[in-house]
Amino acid sequence: MPYIPHTPEELQEMLSVVGVRDLDGLFADIPPEMRPKQFNLPKGQSEAAVCAYFEGLAAKNCPDLVSFLGAGYYAHDIPKAVDALAGRSEFYTSYTPYQPECSQGTLQAIFEFQTAISRLLGMDCANASVYDGGTAIFEAAMMAVRSTRRRVLVVDEAVNPIWRVMLASYISSLDLELKTVQQEKGVSRLDALMAAIDDTTAAVIVQNPNFFGAVADYTQVFAKARAHKAFGVISVYPVMQSVLKTPGEMGADVAVAEGQSIGMPLSFGGPYLGLMTCRKEHIRQFPGRIVGRTTDVDGKTGYVLTLQAREQHIRRAKATSNICSNQALCALRALIHLSLLGPCGLTRLAENNMALTRYAVERLTSIKGIELLNDAPYGNEVALRLPMPAQMLVDALSAHGCVPGYPLGRYYPGMEDVLLLACTERNSRQQIGMLAETVGGLL
């Protein structure tokens, strides 16, 4: 049976209101040669057939694999209270409320989220979230372009390649220049980044730890950017922020992150969470919702959407961004997750994962032919050079129920023999030992 709620009479009534005769008239502005002649879609199926099809797709997943995958998305333990609280009907929406008098609980939760993220990254202000880490980098770049009225973006090649592709796609029709500074053996070249900054630069964009897991201090890079009145933008890994120098301490203008690691399970395509923070002086160029705390006429504390003149529903085409609804439910999960861990718990988590990674490096580099790609400091993720193609190792071990890491040759030509390995609290020393023994046996 069809699940179309409108009768033919209702459809005709709607068409007459907009002034067209039929459905084709709605698309008259699109030239016929630009319209698809047919869609490569299967014929309609019964409910049972559709369920069977998707169950077959789901059965291809391998939830029992021992995984050392990272590359920007990480398998962390999530307290059960996160699901229990975020799943309450009062919160279960991605939409930001416009009517503060009806939604004080949701607004306060977003305000507390902003406070937590600002403190975690050491920055002045945070927004209510954007879609994901890649979107956050683009929005930060556009903040810089609007503020500086410049067209050149300097990007470190060691920034997550997925996010760099997203950035390039977003700006492809905006007459902006993307200037990529090459990494060297997985290490960001700070001197080259500083040399690339001049009076035409809108922003310099870096990542810490970078995609290869290498940790660096970008204070001098941001100082050079500020000297040329350009923005310093940095993407970070939230869990590692409890033990690393914060973006605020480095002097960043905008700090962003993929928030999946704090409260979101791994999922193909999301939903994930884009974190955005900035210095107070840039807040009027900030995209998305911002919740503020105020006092009403009776002296009671209240929470409201503030600085709305930046937004699409007010400024329309002149808004700072076309983002409307944000990832409010994912932001709530992140807030609950951080609150349950607390500052000490988050620090212990990062230290535990770093210790596991050091142990993995110790075991694997004791195997002949395996070595660190570089001698840079690392956190819970590290690049290893192998005596064989990394993809071959991944394929061989996956057949035995273990994914040893990510083959970097997929994104970086010439690094076909480099494996990116990450450890979280979901891994154990026993699993690392089994990984080392299996790899040693194959080599």
UniProtKB/Swiss-Prot annotation:
EC number, UniProt record: 1.4.4.2
Keyword list, A-Z: Oxidoreductase
Catalytic activity line of the entry: N(6)-[(R)-lipoyl]-L-lysyl-[glycine-cleavage complex H protein] + glycine + H(+) = N(6)-[(R)-S(8)-aminomethyldihydrolipoyl]-L-lysyl-[glycine-cleavage complex H protein] + CO2
One GO process term, biological-process aspect: nucleoside metabolic process
Superkingdom per UniProt: Bacteria
Role description: The glycine cleavage system catalyzes the degradation of glycine. The P protein binds the alpha-amino group of glycine through its pyridoxal phosphate cofactor; CO(2) is released and the remaining methylamine moiety is then transferred to the lipoamide cofactor of the H protein.
Xref: HAMAP family: GcvPA (MF_00712)
Assembly mode: The glycine cleavage system is composed of four proteins: P, T, L and H. In this organism, the P 'protein' is a heterodimer of two subunits.
The protein's name: Probable glycine dehydrogenase (decarboxylating) subunit 1
